[in-house]
Amino acid sequence: MKIEEFEKIMQREDREEKQEDLEKIWDSKSEWFFKRTEKKQENFSDRLIFKIVKEKKLLNENSKVLDIGCGTGRHLLEFSKFTSYVTGTDISSRMLDYAKEKLKNVNETKFIHGNWMKNFTKEKEFDLVFASMTPAISKIEHIKRMCLISKNYCMMERFVYYRDPIREEIEKMLGRKLNKLHSNHKEYTYGLWNIVWNLGYFPEIYLDKYISETEKNVIDYMEQIICTDDEENKIIEFLKEKEKNGKIMSKEYIIKAVILWDVNIF
């Protein structure tokens, strides 16, 4: 297969948004995203990404890290435990506000707002270029740029499997499948790995499998379900029966792929 075919596999059929539209979309999601991630009952520092960084000694105290699509700064905060020289970039200024607050005690932290492809062009500027779950990496040229600005490693994290039994109960009640979540787009990882390979690098892939207990509410579920008005009423009624003191405890079954490659062959 030609490398361009893997790019098509990597891309969803979602229409491309203008930068100003994307900024508005992610600004509007920032508070929801922050609250949702902060509610997760997990020790984030135990995630496979940071175990790999530690075991492979990818970073030292002088290393420079770039997080593309850093969001509210969860990964940046963990990277700052290895090095103070962390840079976060995001298209959403409100996401960056949360990140700035989270890393206010890390002296060397930098935050760059806007289109990362326009803002980062310097060759070999960072020791590690990282991206997790971001739509900002969707083309061959994006991956090439990651390799250009890194002098050592590139690392990406993506969902390849996601299961929520409560969503499955809703499907059974409605007698149909719900809309596919972005977190189940495992084809992205397949396309990404093959693009990196075809560019001449040797990507390693690791799987991070875990069960996460997450505190949700009716709104959290409804924001991710496409349905008719009649179905909406049924789903809300069903979810309210699951609620205890306004909270729904969700058990999520998750597999994430972590792809790591060295930009230096030797």
PLM feature spans:
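A short, conserved alpha-helix within the catalytic core of class I
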Residues: 136-149
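Short alpha-helix
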Residues: 184-200, 204-205
